[in-house]
A protein has these predicted regions:
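A short alpha->loop->secondary-structure connector
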Residues: 93-103, 144
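Conserved AdoMet/S-adenosylmethionine-binding subsite of the radical SAM
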Residues: 106-258
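Active-site beta-to-alpha loop of glycosyltransferases that engages the nucleotide-sugar donor
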Residues: 80-83
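Auxiliary Fe-S-binding modules of radical SAM enzymes
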Residues: 1-27, 217-282
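The canonical Cys-X-X-Cys-His
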Residues: 85-89
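Flexible, active-site-adjacent loop/turn segments at secondary-structure boundaries
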Residues: 5, 23, 30-33, 46, ...
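Short, conserved glycine- and acidic-residue-centered signature motifs
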Residues: 69, 102, 188-191, 259, ...
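N-terminal [4Fe-4S]-dependent radical SAM core
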Residues: 1-16, 20-78, 90-95
C-alpha cells in the first residue's frame, strides 16, 4: 500500500477527493472503487503496484487508430473501478476483486516495456484512474526513459488530479458511455457531466484523444441521443476519432447483441459531423 493522494481529513472521517463520488469514509472503510481504504486515519491506495493483467497488444486494441498505428504497446491492468456498469466488459478484475495479482514496481514496468520493445505503456483493462498513485509514478518514470503513456479510462476523475496526470499522458481512449444523466446514474452509478468535463480538459491538453461508445439496445441506441453525442464531440474538435462498439451480453446485463444495422446507422450519423468514425466488435 501507499498513502493516497487527493484526500482530506474532516474530523473523524476522511473525504476522498480523487473522483466525483467524494467518498466520506470512517476508519476501516473502503471507497466505492474498492481500492482506497482508511487505516490509522489516513487514506491508502491498496492496489499500488498490484498488477492483474500484463500483455503486449496492438495499439489498435485499446482502441487507438490514429496514434502510432501498427505499433505494439505493453498493457498493464490492476483491479477495481469507480463505476459499477451493469455491462462491464472486464468485470473479473474491475468488479470482482478476488483474483491473483503480482507486485510490479514502476521501475520494473518501465524495464519490461523496454525489454518488450514497446514504445510505451498502456494503463488499461481495469480503471487506471483509481490506480492513480502508481499510474502517476510510473508515467513520470516512463517519460524520463523516453516512453509514451497511454490511458484507457472511463474518465471519472476530478479536474485537479486529472490535470496533474495529463502532464505525463500522451494519448487517451475515453469511454463516453451515453449522453444522459439517467443512463450514467442507473446503469453505472456515475454522473455524465463529470465525464464530459474530463473530455473537455483532455481535449485542451497536449494528449491525443479518441472516444469509444458501446452501443447497447434500448439503453443508449436512440439515434437522437447519438446525434447529441456527435454534436458534443464535434463542438470540441470534429477530428476526434469516435469508436462505436457493438455490445454483447456481459456481466449483469443480458440484452441481445446490438444489431449490426444499428451500428451502420450510427456510423452514418456520426460521419455527418466527424472525420474519423470506426466500428468495433462487428
Amino acid at each position: 500500500m501507499q498513502e493516497a493522494a487527493y484526500y482530506e481529513q474532516q474530523g473523524d472521517t476522511i473525504k476522498c477527493l480523487l473522483c466525483p463520488h467524494y467518498c466520506q469514509l470512517d476508519e476501516g472503510d473502503t471507497g466505492l472503487c474498492q481500492v482506497r481504504k482508511v487505516e490509522n486515519n489516513k487514506l491508502w491506495a491498496t492496489s499500488y503496484g498490484r498488477v492483474s493483467s500484463v500483455a503486449v497488444d496492438p495499439i489498435e486494441k485499446k482502441p487507438l487508430y490514429n496514434y502510432h498505428p501498427q505499433s505494439q504497446i505493453l498493457s498493464l491492468g490492476s483491479i477495481g473501478c469507480n463505476l459499477s456498469c451493469q455491462f462491464c466488459q472486464n468485470y473479473q478484475i474491475a468488479q470482482e476483486l478476488d483474483i491473483p495479482t503480482k507486485q510490479l514496481s514502476s521501475q520494473e514496468a518501465v524495464e519490461l516495456a523496454k525489454q518488450k520493445e514497446s514504445f510505451g505503456i498502456a494503463y488499461t483493462y481495469s480503471e487506471p484512474l483509481i490506480w492513480y498513485e502508481y499510474l502517476l509514478d510510473t508515467a513520470q518514470l516512463a517519460h524520463q526513459e523516453g516512453l509514451k503513456n497511454i490511458l484507457v479510462t472511463n474518465g471519472y476523475i476530478n479536474p485537479e488530479p486529472l490535470k496533474e496526470l495529463l502532464t505525463y499522458i500522451d494519448a487517451v481512449n475515453l469511454d463516453l458511455k451515453a449522453m444522459t444523466e439517467e443512463f450514467y446514474h442507473q446503469t453505472c452509478q456515475g454522473q455524465l457531466q463529470a465525464v464530459k468535463e474530463t473530455v473537455k480538459i483532455i481535449n485542451q491538453s497536449d494528449a491525443h484523444l479518441e472516444i469509444t461508445t458501446l452501443i447497447i439496445p434500448d439503453l443508449n441506441d436512440d439515434l437522437e441521443e447519438l446525434k447529441e453525442l456527435v454534436d458534443f464531440i464535434a463542438s470540441l474538435d470534429p477530428d476526434i476519432p469516435l469508436h462505436l462498439s457493438r455490445y454483447f451480453p456481459c456481466y449483469q446485463l443480458d440484452k441481445p447483441p446490438t444489431p449490426k444495422e444499428t451500428l451502420y446507422q450510427a456510423q452514418e450519423i456520426a460521419e455527418e459531423k466527424l472525420t474519423n468514425v470506426y466500428l468495433g466488435n462487428i
